[in-house]
Amino acid sequence: MKEKLIELVEKEYLRSDIPQFKAGDTIGVYYKVKEGNKERVQLFEGVVIRVNGGGVAKTFTVRKVTAGIGVERIIPVNSPNIDRIEVLKVGRVRRSKLYYLRGLSAKKARIKEIVK
């Protein structure tokens, strides 16, 4: 009974407009940013290094390298601050968590792409 009630409440907050992606894919996350009374959309583009959790609590971590510095952002999938997500490249990896990319240089951190 309790699980059904939780599922019913969670169903309202699940988003259906999010595409399927996995670790190794390069994605662009268009994130809504509020600055004072203005709101704008900011692009965060990088490689998904981790997908964690499920349901409403599902999150993913995106990593990009900017000016030689690695930047990671943990983003909730069902966040209302996400405008949209685009899958730019589908990567071919054999791991579900790509933490080893943190220690690699830019050229070695490249991921093979699946060509369709």
Curated annotation (Swiss-Prot):
- What cystine pairs are annotated? none
Q: Where is the signal peptide?
A: none
**UniProt KW Transferase keyword:** no
* GO annotation, biological process: translation
Name recorded for this polypeptide:
Large ribosomal subunit protein bL19
What does UniProt give as GO cellular component?
cytosolic large ribosomal subunit
**PANTHER family xref list:** LARGE RIBOSOMAL SUBUNIT PROTEIN BL19M, RIBOSOMAL PROTEIN L19
Described function: This protein is located at the 30S-50S ribosomal subunit interface and may play a role in the structure and function of the aminoacyl-tRNA binding site.
Q: Which family does the UniProt entry place this protein in?
A: Belongs to the bacterial ribosomal protein bL19 family.
In terms of InterPro entries, this protein maps to:
Ribosomal_bL19 (IPR001857), Ribosomal_bL19_CS (IPR018257), Ribosomal_bL19_sf (IPR038657), Translation_prot_SH3-like_sf (IPR008991)
Q: Which HAMAP family match?
A: Ribosomal_bL19
Spell out the SUPFAM superfamilies in the cross-references: Translation proteins SH3-like domain
Claim: Signal is one of the keywords in the record? no
Cross-referenced PROSITE patterns: RIBOSOMAL_L19 (PS01015)
Checking Gene3D superfamilies in the record gives: 2.30.30.790
- GO MF annotations in UniProt: structural constituent of ribosome
Annotated keywords: Ribonucleoprotein, Ribosomal protein
The record, for Pfam families, names:
Ribosomal_L19
